[in-house]
C-alpha cells in the first residue's frame, strides 16, 4: 500500500470516528479520493507532499474531459480540499494545493416535484400485504415530514412519539430535528407496527426489510419506483422527489420560507429559496393559462 492510500485511509477513519459521518457520506469521500489517488499514481507521485496546484488543475481538467459534470467536479474538488486541509492540520503538508482551484459553476437545476393529484394517487395504496403496508408508511412519513432518504432509513422505533404525531431525526452534521408527520403517517406507522414482528423484532430500526434487517436506501429507491409505476404515475418516483414535493406544497400553502427551512433542516436559507422559484413557476403557468393578456394571438 502506498503512502497515498495510507493517508486517505487515516483520513477516512478520522471522518468516521471523530466527525461521525454517515456510511453513505464516507463512501462518497472514498470514491472521490480514490479518483485523485489513481491520477496521482499515474503521474508518478509517491506522497501527497509532491502534489501542487498545477497537478490539481490537471486533475480537474482530466475529470471534465472524461465527462464529469460541473456539479460532480465541484463535489470532487471539495472532498480533495477537505482532505488536504486535514493533512495540513496533521503537519503532513505546509499548504493546501487545492485551495485556489475551483470547478466551473454548475447550472442550478430546479428540483422536480410530484403534484398534489399524483401524490394522492401514489399514496392510495390500500393493500393489506405487510410489505405494501410498510411501503405506504414510508411514503407517508417521507412526504409528511419532508425527510431525507438517509433520515428515513435511519429511523428507530424509539424516535417515534405517535401520541404527539412527531418523530426525531438526525440530519446532516448530526443535527437533531423534531418534526410533525401528520395523522395519515401516524395511522400507517401504527398499521405497520402491528405487522412488523412478522419480519423479526431484534433490530431497533422502524422500517425492516423482508429479511428482518434495517431497510437499505437502495431498497427504498427500488420500492418507491415500483409503486410509481403500479399507481400509474408518468414520472419516475425517487425518494428525494417526495422531499421536494413536501417543500413545494408547504411553501405554496403557507409562504413561510423560514418555517420550511426549519422543517427541511437546511443550514442556509438560500438552499430553501430554490423552492420559491418552483412556486413562481407554478404561478406563472397559472397566469399564462388563465390571464387574457397572457394568451398569444388574442
From Swiss-Prot:
The encoding gene: xerC
HAMAP family from the UniProt entry: Recomb_XerC_XerD
Record-annotated Core-binding (CB) domain positions: 2-88
UniProt cross-references to Gene3D superfamilies, sorted A to Z: 1.10.150.130, Intergrase catalytic core (1.10.443.10)
Subunit structure: Forms a cyclic heterotetrameric complex composed of two molecules of XerC and two molecules of XerD, in which XerC interacts with XerD via its C-terminal region, XerD interacts with XerC via its C-terminal region and so on.
Similarity field: Belongs to the 'phage' integrase family. XerC subfamily.
Originating species: Shigella flexneri serotype 5b (strain 8401)
Biological-process GO terms, alphabetical: cell division; chromosome segregation; DNA transposition
Protein name: Tyrosine recombinase XerC
Summary of activators and inhibitors of this protein: FtsK may regulate the catalytic switch between XerC and XerD in the heterotetrameric complex during the two steps of the recombination process.
Single annotated GO MF: DNA binding
Lineage, broadest ranks: Bacteria, Pseudomonadati, Pseudomonadota, Gammaproteobacteria, Enterobacterales
Gene Ontology cellular-component annotations: cytoplasm
Subcellular localization(s) per the UniProt record: Cytoplasm
Keywords annotated in UniProt: Cell cycle, Cell division, Chromosome partition, Cytoplasm, DNA integration, DNA recombination, DNA-binding
Active site (catalytic residues): 148, 172, 240, 243, 266, 275
Main location group: cytoplasm
Function in brief: Site-specific tyrosine recombinase, which acts by catalyzing the cutting and rejoining of the recombining DNA molecules. Binds cooperatively to specific DNA consensus sequences that are separated from XerD binding sites by a short central region, forming the heterotetrameric XerC-XerD complex that recombines DNA substrates. The complex is essential to convert dimers of the bacterial chromosome into monomers to permit their segregation at cell division. It also contributes to the segregational stability of plasmids. In the complex XerC specifically exchanges the top DNA strands.
Residues of the Tyr recombinase domain: 109-288
Domain of life assignment: Bacteria
Amino acid at each position: 500500500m502506498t503512502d497515498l492510500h495510507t493517508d486517505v485511509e487515516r483520513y477516512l477513519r478520522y471522518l468516521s470516528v471523530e466527525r461521525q459521518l454517515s456510511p453513505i457520506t464516507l463512501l462518497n469521500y472514498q470514491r472521490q479520493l480514490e479518483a485523485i489517488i489513481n491520477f496521482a499514481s499515474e503521474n508518478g507521485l509517491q506522497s501527497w507532499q509532491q502534489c501542487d496546484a498545477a497537478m490539481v488543475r490537471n486533475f480537474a481538467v482530466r475529470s471534465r474531459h472524461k465527462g464529469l459534470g460541473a456539479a460532480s467536479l465541484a463535489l470532487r474538488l471539495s472532498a480533495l480540499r477537505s482532505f488536504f486541509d486535514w493533512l495540513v492540520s496533521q503537519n503532513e503538508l505546509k499548504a493546501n494545493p487545492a485551495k485556489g482551484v475551483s470547478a466551473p459553476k454548475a447550472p442550478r437545476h430546479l428540483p422536480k416535484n410530484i403534484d398534489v393529484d399524483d401524490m394522492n394517487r401514489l399514496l392510495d395504496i390500500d393493500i393489506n400485504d405487510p410489505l405494501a403496508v410498510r411501503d405506504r408508511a414510508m411514503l407517508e412519513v417521507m412526504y409528511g415530514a419532508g425527510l431525507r432518504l438517509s433520515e428515513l432509513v435511519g429511523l428507530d422505533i424509539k424516535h417515534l412519539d405517535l401520541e404527539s404525531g412527531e418523530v426525531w431525526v438526525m440530519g446532516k452534521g448530526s443535527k437533531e430535528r423534531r418534526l410533525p408527520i401528520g395523522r395519515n403517517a401516524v395511522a400507517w406507522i401504527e398499521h405497520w407496527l402491528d405487522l412488523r414482528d412478522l419480519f423479526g423484532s431484534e433490530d431497533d430500526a422502524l422500517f425492516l426489510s423482508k429479511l428482518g434487517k434495517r431497510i437499505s436506501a437502495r431498497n427504498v429507491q427500488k420500492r418507491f419506483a415500483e409503486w410509481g409505476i403500479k399507481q400509474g404515475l408518468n414520472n419516475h418516483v425517487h425518494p428525494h422527489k417526495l422531499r421536494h414535493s413536501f417543500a413545494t406544497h408547504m411553501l405554496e400553502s403557507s409562504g413561510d420560507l423560514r418555517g420550511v427551512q426549519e422543517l427541511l433542516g437546511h443550514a442556509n436559507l438560500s438552499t430553501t429559496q430554490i423552492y420559491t422559484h418552483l412556486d413562481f413557476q407554478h404561478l406563472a403557468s397559472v397566469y399564462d393559462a388563465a390571464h387574457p393578456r397572457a394568451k398569444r394571438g388574442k
